Regions:
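Short Gly/Thr/Asp-enriched flexible loops that form oxyanion-binding sites at enzyme active sites
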Residues: 96-116
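Glycine-rich phosphate/diphosphate-binding loops that line cofactor/substrate pockets in enzymes
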Residues: 1, 78-90
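Short, intrinsically disordered, charge-balanced linker/junction segments flanking boundaries
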Residues: 116-122
């Protein structure tokens, strides 16, 4: 019997540069939040790279106005795992930045504990 698997990547994995490819392969994305100029964006979804870089070039006080990132929410991670489970997946392989570079991996690991009776999350 074949085990159905799903690959999940955080948007920090640069996979967003080939969206047609990750969609074709069935890879899901857990998106990082970008905070910039008083607005919040989901990386790779509602933040156009060209517009973003143009905005960076015109910052009046770059030292104090640089963009910041924030982790995805627990609900966003659960929604991703729920979709995988509903698709019949028994295993999920998550590709994310190191736990030493931010809190996203640790949050993913904590959320994955809630699914240990349903599927294996690596």
């Amino acid at each position: 019997m074949e085990i159905k698997r799903k690959v999940v990547c955080t948007s920090t994995g640069c996979i967003e540069y080939a969206p047609e490819r990750y969609r074709q392969l069935g890879i899901d994305i857990i998106r990082i939040h970008v905070l910039f100029k008083g607005k919040e964006y989901l990386e790779g979804l509602d933040l156009d790279p060209d517009a973003f870089y143009k905005e960076l070039e015109t910052l009046e006080d770059p030292k104090n106005n640089l963009p910041r990132t924030a982790m995805p929410t627990e609900e966003e991670i659960k929604a991703c795992f729920d979709r995988a489970y509903e698709e019949g997946c028994k295993e999920v392989i998550v590709i994310a930045l190191s736990a030493y570079l931010g809190g996203t991996w640790n949050l993913i690991r904590l959320v994955s504990e809630q699914y240990k009776d349903k599927m294996t999350i690596h």
